[in-house]
Amino acid sequence: MNNLRQEFIKFSVDTGVLRFGEFVTKAGRTSPYFFNAGLFNQGGTLARLADFYAQTLIDSGVEFDMLFGPAYKGITLASATAVALANKGRDVPFAFNRKEAKDHGEGGTMVGAKLQGRVVIIDDVISAGTSVRESVDMIRAAGATPCAVLIALDRMERSGADDALSAYSAVQEVSNTYGMPVISIGNLSDLFEYLSNAGADSEQAQYRDAVSAYRKRYGVT
């Protein structure tokens, strides 16, 4: 058992970011759980989340020089993670992009430190991989090297329509396409372990079978 990963799942449940029930995903699937990182919307919870990101990145052993947060959620995540890393003795620069180019002041679409060296892309989840693809293009265009993607939760789900499921998840496809690791604080296996360890009379225990069935249908190995 990885205590950090289990602590993160519990933290997400306790803050209401990770909920159980019936939810329709972007892919049109009915999922027994829903993870909404936008609900990490208070200073204290954001600080704790950033600490999870920072510690996970340190523990991964990935060598990096700076952070990049794609607009919009990635902006806050990269900024907060940079603060958390500095508090752990690793002071690194960070940058993020605007959705719309600015034609006055410093101009352009990039904000923060100059993109250079080995860059870690920070986001909440990977659904279709669009945000990562755009980030990789921007980083490479600046002459820097994307070296890893760091996300909060890996759903470990096979991509594609129900009648044409891929053998790979969106996370695996990103890793294979760009030849770099995708690191997650927690994943579906951690979530299932959390439910399996929940007491029989706990609120979460009732969702164990639903998550197990969902993982059997859509999960990757």
Curated annotation (Swiss-Prot):
Transmembrane segments: none
The organism's place on the tree of life at top rank: Bacteria
Any single Gene Ontology cellular-component annotation: cytoplasm
Pfam families: Pribosyltran
Cofactor(s) the protein requires to work: Mg(2+)
Entry EC number(s): 2.4.2.10
Protein's pathway: Pyrimidine metabolism; UMP biosynthesis via de novo pathway; UMP from orotate: step 1/2
Binding site for 5-phospho-alpha-D-ribose 1-diphosphate: 26, 72-73, 98-99, 102, 104, 123-131
Catalytic activity of the protein: orotidine 5'-phosphate + diphosphate = orotate + 5-phospho-alpha-D-ribose 1-diphosphate
BP GO annotations: 'de novo' pyrimidine nucleobase biosynthetic process; 'de novo' UMP biosynthetic process; pyrimidine ribonucleoside biosynthetic process
Class of this enzyme: transferase
Record-linked CDD domains: PRTases_typeI
Keywords assigned: Glycosyltransferase, Magnesium, Pyrimidine biosynthesis, Transferase
Family: Belongs to the purine/pyrimidine phosphoribosyltransferase family. PyrE subfamily.
NCBIfam families: pyrE
Protein purpose: Catalyzes the transfer of a ribosyl phosphate group from 5-phosphoribose 1-diphosphate to orotate, leading to the formation of orotidine monophosphate (OMP).
Protein name: Orotate phosphoribosyltransferase
